[in-house]
Amino acid sequence: MLGDRAIAAGAEIRLGVVAHAIEDDGAGVTVRLSDGSEDRFDIVIGADGIYSDTRQRIMPEAGTPEYTGQAVWRYNLPRPDDLDALHAFNGPTGVGLVPMSSQMMYMFVTTPEPGNPRYDKAGIARAMREKLSGTAPQIRELAKGITDDEGVVYRPLETMLLYGAWSRGRVVLLGDAVHATTPHLGQGAGMAIEDSIVLAEELARADTPEDAFAAYRERRFERCRYIVESSLAICHGQIGKSPPVDNHAATTQMFEVCAQPI
């Protein structure tokens, strides 16, 4: 839907290419792409995720994402008839059941993973089932359906937050490129969408891109910091790195914070 709306608004979407060079001369930005083409723009927005190449190009001093010590496993399963909302099971191995349609749900499982191990794709379904061996009986029963290695999505949880500037010259960062959060409060995509709204507003009213970028960062930093740090506190509490956090209370507070104007 977002892609269709962008095209309808006049955007040109090019797939299968990446920026090989970003050169800001103060009057505009020249971008050379991996297919050999080159174009010039008024500004560049790096919305390219936690491993942002744009961030590395304009702020090599920004560092890299930090591994939290926890990972998440995901798998789609048939939805039980009585599952009509998110069901969460807390503990060192956390489990969530999330309805997706009248027929399907997905299960997510958070586990402590010291040392950031890697799991081979062959046998990863068995590994996920084994992670659930000490959970509640109903979860162990559902785990019997985790059989397809290709269906398992495993991700180490990493985080980062730029406490300084979010832009350099005519190039600005957005979303996970500047404030990557763990999923414990479910606000990663929401923060990126809010970023885009605020950035558009500030570009429309500012005299220069630099002024717009500074105002955008000023409006966004505290809320994004709150989400990143609060999510990480839940994560660390679950794996014993810090005191446990009351997930229900943290989620209630998050809804109150995110209901405020941006």
Locate predicted features:
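Short alpha-helical linear motifs
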Residues: 234-242, 254-255
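Conserved mid-domain beta->alpha element of the FAD-binding
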Residues: 45-46, 128, 151-237
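Short amphipathic alpha-helical segments
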Residues: 56-59, 186, 240
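Conserved FAD-binding catalytic core of PHBH/FMO-like flavoproteins
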Residues: 1-141, 163
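Conserved, helical-rich catalytic subdomain that frames metal- and/or nucleotide-binding sites
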Residues: 144-147
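Compositionally biased, low-complexity intrinsically disordered regions
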Residues: 222, 249-252
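C-terminal auxiliary extensions adjacent to catalytic cores
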Residues: 251-262
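C-terminal domain-tail junction helix/linker
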Residues: 243-248
